[in-house]
Regions:
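Mature catalytic core of soluble alpha/beta enzymes
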Residues: 1-155
Protein backbone atom coordinates (compact mmCIF):
# COMPACT_ATOMS: atom_id res chain seq x y z
CA UNK A 1 0.00 0.00 0.00
CA UNK A 2 2.90 2.37 0.77
CA UNK A 3 4.40 1.98 -2.69
CA UNK A 4 1.06 2.50 -4.45
CA UNK A 5 0.33 5.57 -2.32
CA UNK A 6 3.75 7.02 -3.11
CA UNK A 7 3.21 6.51 -6.84
CA UNK A 8 -0.06 8.45 -6.63
CA UNK A 9 1.67 11.22 -4.62
CA UNK A 10 4.50 11.33 -7.19
CA UNK A 11 1.85 12.00 -9.87
CA UNK A 12 0.80 15.11 -7.97
CA UNK A 13 -2.07 13.91 -5.80
CA UNK A 14 -1.16 14.74 -2.22
CA UNK A 15 -4.29 13.29 -0.61
CA UNK A 16 -4.61 9.54 -1.07
CA UNK A 17 -5.58 6.42 0.85
CA UNK A 18 -4.69 3.00 -0.55
CA UNK A 19 -6.13 -0.26 0.82
CA UNK A 20 -4.08 -3.27 -0.29
CA UNK A 21 -5.70 -6.42 1.12
CA UNK A 22 -6.44 -4.69 4.42
CA UNK A 23 -3.14 -2.88 4.84
CA UNK A 24 -3.85 0.84 4.41
CA UNK A 25 -1.49 3.71 3.57
CA UNK A 26 -2.76 7.25 4.11
CA UNK A 27 -1.12 10.37 2.73
CA UNK A 28 -2.46 13.87 3.19
CA UNK A 29 -6.06 14.32 4.28
CA UNK A 30 -9.47 12.86 3.42
CA UNK A 31 -10.77 16.41 2.89
CA UNK A 32 -9.46 19.83 3.98
CA UNK A 33 -8.88 19.75 7.72
CA UNK A 34 -10.07 16.14 8.08
CA UNK A 35 -7.71 13.16 8.46
CA UNK A 36 -8.41 9.76 6.97
CA UNK A 37 -10.61 7.58 9.20
CA UNK A 38 -9.79 3.86 9.25
CA UNK A 39 -11.71 1.20 11.16
CA UNK A 40 -10.19 -1.64 13.17
CA UNK A 41 -12.30 -4.76 12.73
CA UNK A 42 -13.53 -7.12 15.41
CA UNK A 43 -11.39 -10.29 15.32
CA UNK A 44 -14.46 -12.53 14.93
CA UNK A 45 -16.14 -10.48 12.19
CA UNK A 46 -14.69 -8.75 9.17
CA UNK A 47 -17.71 -6.41 9.06
CA UNK A 48 -17.82 -5.07 12.64
CA UNK A 49 -15.65 -2.08 13.54
CA UNK A 50 -14.52 -1.92 17.19
CA UNK A 51 -12.44 1.25 16.93
CA UNK A 52 -11.69 3.97 14.42
CA UNK A 53 -8.47 5.93 14.14
CA UNK A 54 -7.69 9.17 12.36
CA UNK A 55 -4.58 8.95 10.19
CA UNK A 56 -2.38 11.21 8.09
CA UNK A 57 1.01 10.34 6.64
CA UNK A 58 1.14 6.80 8.02
CA UNK A 59 0.10 3.20 7.46
CA UNK A 60 -1.97 0.65 9.36
CA UNK A 61 -1.74 -3.15 9.22
CA UNK A 62 -3.62 -5.89 11.08
CA UNK A 63 -2.67 -9.52 11.64
CA UNK A 64 -5.28 -12.02 12.72
CA UNK A 65 -6.80 -15.36 11.92
CA UNK A 66 -10.25 -14.20 10.78
CA UNK A 67 -9.61 -13.98 7.02
CA UNK A 68 -6.99 -16.62 6.20
CA UNK A 69 -7.37 -18.91 9.19
CA UNK A 70 -4.44 -20.12 11.21
CA UNK A 71 -1.68 -19.40 8.69
CA UNK A 72 0.92 -18.03 11.10
CA UNK A 73 3.66 -20.18 12.62
CA UNK A 74 5.42 -19.45 15.88
CA UNK A 75 9.04 -19.40 14.62
CA UNK A 76 10.39 -20.54 17.99
CA UNK A 77 8.37 -23.74 18.06
CA UNK A 78 7.28 -24.28 14.44
CA UNK A 79 3.61 -24.64 15.38
CA UNK A 80 0.42 -22.75 14.56
CA UNK A 81 0.01 -20.86 17.80
CA UNK A 82 -0.80 -17.23 18.47
CA UNK A 83 -1.36 -15.36 21.71
CA UNK A 84 -3.83 -12.75 20.43
CA UNK A 85 -7.02 -12.74 18.38
CA UNK A 86 -5.73 -9.79 16.34
CA UNK A 87 -3.00 -7.15 16.39
CA UNK A 88 -3.11 -3.82 14.59
CA UNK A 89 -0.05 -1.59 14.19
CA UNK A 90 0.08 2.01 12.99
CA UNK A 91 3.30 3.72 11.97
CA UNK A 92 5.25 5.52 9.26
CA UNK A 93 6.19 2.36 7.30
CA UNK A 94 3.54 -0.09 6.08
CA UNK A 95 5.91 -3.03 5.61
CA UNK A 96 7.24 -2.71 9.13
CA UNK A 97 3.69 -2.21 10.47
CA UNK A 98 2.70 -5.52 8.86
CA UNK A 99 5.74 -7.32 10.28
CA UNK A 100 5.22 -5.88 13.77
CA UNK A 101 1.52 -6.83 13.71
CA UNK A 102 2.50 -10.44 12.97
CA UNK A 103 5.11 -10.40 15.75
CA UNK A 104 2.51 -9.09 18.20
CA UNK A 105 0.02 -11.76 17.14
CA UNK A 106 2.58 -14.47 17.95
CA UNK A 107 4.22 -12.87 21.01
CA UNK A 108 1.19 -11.16 22.55
CA UNK A 109 1.91 -8.39 25.01
CA UNK A 110 5.53 -9.58 25.23
CA UNK A 111 5.96 -8.31 21.68
CA UNK A 112 5.44 -4.74 22.82
CA UNK A 113 9.14 -4.68 23.74
CA UNK A 114 9.85 -4.20 20.02
CA UNK A 115 8.20 -0.78 20.28
CA UNK A 116 10.72 0.58 22.78
CA UNK A 117 12.33 3.55 21.07
CA UNK A 118 9.60 3.81 18.42
CA UNK A 119 7.59 6.81 19.67
CA UNK A 120 5.65 7.29 16.41
CA UNK A 121 4.20 3.77 16.47
CA UNK A 122 0.91 2.56 17.96
CA UNK A 123 -0.69 -0.82 18.57
CA UNK A 124 -4.16 -2.20 19.25
CA UNK A 125 -4.20 -5.78 20.55
CA UNK A 126 -7.34 -7.90 21.01
CA UNK A 127 -7.71 -11.14 22.93
CA UNK A 128 -10.65 -12.87 24.54
CA UNK A 129 -13.05 -9.97 24.18
CA UNK A 130 -10.63 -7.36 25.53
CA UNK A 131 -8.46 -4.77 23.83
CA UNK A 132 -5.13 -3.30 24.89
CA UNK A 133 -3.67 -0.30 23.11
CA UNK A 134 -0.70 2.04 23.18
CA UNK A 135 0.83 4.88 21.22
CA UNK A 136 -0.09 8.28 19.84
CA UNK A 137 -2.82 7.06 17.47
CA UNK A 138 -4.97 6.18 20.49
CA UNK A 139 -4.46 9.31 22.57
CA UNK A 140 -7.78 10.86 21.47
CA UNK A 141 -10.81 10.79 23.77
CA UNK A 142 -12.79 8.61 21.35
CA UNK A 143 -13.53 5.19 22.80
CA UNK A 144 -14.41 1.89 21.13
CA UNK A 145 -17.71 0.06 21.47
CA UNK A 146 -18.85 -0.19 25.07
CA UNK A 147 -19.28 -3.97 24.97
CA UNK A 148 -15.66 -4.49 23.90
CA UNK A 149 -13.71 -3.40 27.00
CA UNK A 150 -10.32 -1.81 26.50
CA UNK A 151 -7.40 -0.80 28.59
CA UNK A 152 -4.44 1.38 27.80
CA UNK A 153 -1.15 -0.50 27.96
CA UNK A 154 1.88 1.10 29.55
CA UNK A 155 4.88 0.70 27.23
Amino acid sequence: ADIAAQIVVDYGFSNVSVNAAGDVACRGQQSPGRPWVVGILHPDSNKEVVRTVELTECSIATSGLFERGNHILDPHRGVHEVRLDSATVIGPDGGLADALATVLLIEGERGMRFFAGLPDWSGYLMRGGRAFYFGPAFESAEQPRRDFPTQRSNT
